[in-house]
Regions:
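Amphipathic coiled-coil/heptad-repeat helices and related helical stalk/stem segments
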Residues: 18, 98, 125-126, 166-169, ...
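A short acidic, glycine-rich active-site loop
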Residues: 55-70
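P-loop/Walker A phosphate-binding loop and immediately adjacent motor/lid segment at beta-alpha junctions
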Residues: 80-81, 85, 123-144, 204-216
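Structural beta-alpha unit
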Residues: 77-112, 209-242, 248-251, 270
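Conserved beta-strand termini and adjacent loop/short-helix elements that scaffold enzyme active sites
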Residues: 38, 89-93, 143, 186-188, ...
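Small/aliphatic-rich secondary-structure junction motif
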Residues: 1-57, 135-136, 152-219, 239
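Gly/Ser-rich helix-loop-strand patches that form or flank binding pockets
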Residues: 19, 24-28, 101-149, 233-276
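Short histidine/acidic/glycine/proline-rich micro-motifs that form metal-
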Residues: 13, 62, 92-95, 118-120, ...
Length: 276
């Protein structure tokens, strides 16, 4: 059951793909929705910035707060039009702590929704996604920044590699899978294999015991990178949602995204639920 959702509201944009998607998701599941807009406060680290007048720092903060207010207003209007119960929060934070802050906040919700970072822009979505994935203990749906449609589950792709993260993602995604019209479990084969057994059969049988109709397929990825192979296949079958484990590794006591996960997040074409 999905009863409450938290969405990171993107500031400084006219159309927030994450907010739009989260509102539609909350409407489908009759879930309570909380929108969070961060106000980035440079005053905390002002002692590290030599020679910048305090007035300029305060002006930067005021500008960020204005953008956060606008994001909240747009979100509340979207929710009102959809008849979704919501509340909004604005949280002061320094850029270096935004991921941890959102991760701790997301622990109290069934899942979080975050917009994909736009390429070549210095945005905070990546640390927020990392915080949600590695600090919250909950699943996160990342929405492409170009997404215009609301939540749909006509064709759901489910990534399977036998890992703990993949199993966790499938468990977290059950409310979505139960609404899916078509479910395809896919495994990626990066090169030639003599293994005649189709990976994913066991997890497919598990889902079938829940009354779900699934197909199991291999995605060949010889000669191309794994994210490219996955997203190409998603386009071929007109998938509108994907479920996968979110992978990372520890570095200096922090978790950072693994290569395949980072590749999907950089080039994603469909909303994707990730769990770790």
């Amino acid at each position: 059951m999905i009863k409450d959702i938290v969405v990171n509201l993107t500031i400084g944009v006219e159309r927030d793909a994450a907010a739009n998607y989260a509102v539609s998701l909350a409407s489908i599941f009759k879930a309570h929705l909380v929108g969070v807009a961060f106000v980035y406060d440079p005053k905390v680290s002002a002692n590290l910035i030599v020679g910048i007048p305090a007035e300029l720092i305060e002006a930067q903060r005021a500008a960020t707060k204005h953008l956060a207010n606008e994001a909240v207003a747009r979100f509340e209007e979207l929710a009102k039009q959809a008849g979704v119960m919501t509340e909004s929060q604005m949280i002061d934070v320094t850029p270096g702590h935004v991921g941890d802050t959102f991760g701790r906040l997301a622990r109290s919700f069934d899942l979080s929704v975050i917009r994909q970072a736009e390429p070549n822009k210095a945005e905070q979505e990546v640390p927020i996604i990392e915080g949600a994935l590695f600090e919250s203990g909950r699943s996160v749906i990342v929405v492409p920044y170009v997404q215009t449609q609301g939540a749909k589950f006509n064709c759901v792709m489910v990534g399977w590699d036998g890992s703990r993260a993949a199993a966790r993602a499938i468990g977290d995604a059950m409310p979505v899978l139960e609404r899916a019209k078509m479910i395809e479990i896919f495994t990626v084969v990066a090169g030639p294999t003599k293994n005649t057994e189709l990976p994913g059969i066991d997890i497919g049988q598990h889902l079938s015991r829940h009354g779900l109709k699934v197909e199991v397929k291999r995605i060949p990825a010889e000669g191309i990178n794994v994210p490219e192979a996955i997203l190409s296949h998603a386009a071929d079958i007109s998938a509108d949602f994907m479920v996968m484990g979110g992978y990372g590794h520890s570095r200096l006591r922090e978790y950072v995204l693994g290569g395949a996960t980072r590749g999907i997040l950089a080039s994603m074409t469909l909303p994707t639920l990730m769990s770790n």
